[in-house]
């Protein structure tokens, strides 16, 4: 399939699917090379703990996903292999990290600002029997 040549070993109907697979494998290879080009310690030093957790989880998920694909290519049903439970466990941790990230992004209440906003937003109608501004300083005694 390299160089766009047609191979007679498989039906023509699956040519597009095989080409897409080959392209995807190339993309995965490129990403892994990029990821492996920087030492893990060097990468993690630049990140805060939450980002470090994300990198570790994505790395573990990627590795286990690739093992899932490997098992499938070897004729082993990955759904019946312990790798399935491992992927589910990693997903649980990914969801926890996502919840933490979402909580950090959520709007926080500034009580002082909210109090000022409510106080200034309330409208008080003028009473009919209130003295004029000119009479404000004078008393009726």
From Swiss-Prot:
Q: Which GO terms describe its biological process?
A: apoptotic process; maturation of 5.8S rRNA; regulation of gene expression
Give the GO molecular function terms. DNA binding; RNA binding
User: Where is the region Interaction with NR1D1?
Assistant: 50-100
Question: Is this entry keyworded DNA-binding?
Answer: yes
- Which stretches of sequence are listed as region Interaction with NCOR1 and NCOR2? 100-141
Q: Does the keyword Membrane apply?
A: no
Could you tell me at which residue positions the Glycyl lysine isopeptide (Lys-Gly) (interchain with G-Cter in SUMO2) crosslink is annotated in this chain?
A: 119, 126
**Cellular location of this protein?**
Nucleus; Cytoplasm; Nucleus, Nucleolus
| PTM characteristics | Phosphorylated by PRKDC.
Start and end residues of each stretch annotated as Required for transcriptional repression: 1-100
An example Gene Ontology CC term for this record = nucleolus
Give the UniProt keywords, A-Z. Apoptosis, Cytoplasm, DNA-binding, Isopeptide bond, Nucleus, Phosphoprotein, Repressor, RNA-binding, rRNA processing, Transcription, Transcription regulation, Ubl conjugation
- Cite the record's note on assembly: Monomer and homodimer. Interacts with NR1D1, THRA, THRB, NCOR1 and NCOR2. Associates with the RNA exosome complex. Interacts with EXOSC10; the interaction probably mediates the association with the nuclear form of the RNA exosome. The homodimeric form interacts with TSNAX following gamma-radiation. Interacts with RAC3. Associates with the RNA exosome complex.
Function, as annotated, reads: Plays a role in the recruitment of the RNA exosome complex to pre-rRNA to mediate the 3'-5' end processing of the 5.8S rRNA; this function may include MPHOSPH6. Can activate PRKDC not only in the presence of linear DNA but also in the presence of supercoiled DNA. Can induce apoptosis in a p53/TP53 dependent manner. May regulate the TRAX/TSN complex formation. Potentiates transcriptional repression by NR1D1 and THRB.
- The name on file for this protein is Nuclear nucleic acid-binding protein C1D
Gene (UniProt): C1D
């Amino acid at each position: 399939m390299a160089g766009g040549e047609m191979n007679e070993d498989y039906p023509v109907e699956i040519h597009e699917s095989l080409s897409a697979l080959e392209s995807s494998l190339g993309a995965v290879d490129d990403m892994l090379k990029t990821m492996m080009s920087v030492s893990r310690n060097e990468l993690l030093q630049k990140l805060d703990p939450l980002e470090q957790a994300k990198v570790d989880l994505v790395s573990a998920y990627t590795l286990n996903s690739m093992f899932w694909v490997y098992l499938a290519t070897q004729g082993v049903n990955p759904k019946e292999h312990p790798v399935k439970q491992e992927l589910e466990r990693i997903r649980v941790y990914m969801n926890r990290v996502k919840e933490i990230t979402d909580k950090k992004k959520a709007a926080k209440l500034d009580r002082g600002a909210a109090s000022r906003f409510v106080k200034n937003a309330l409208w008080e109608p003028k009473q009919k029997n209130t003295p004029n501004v000119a009479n404000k300083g004078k008393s009726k005694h």
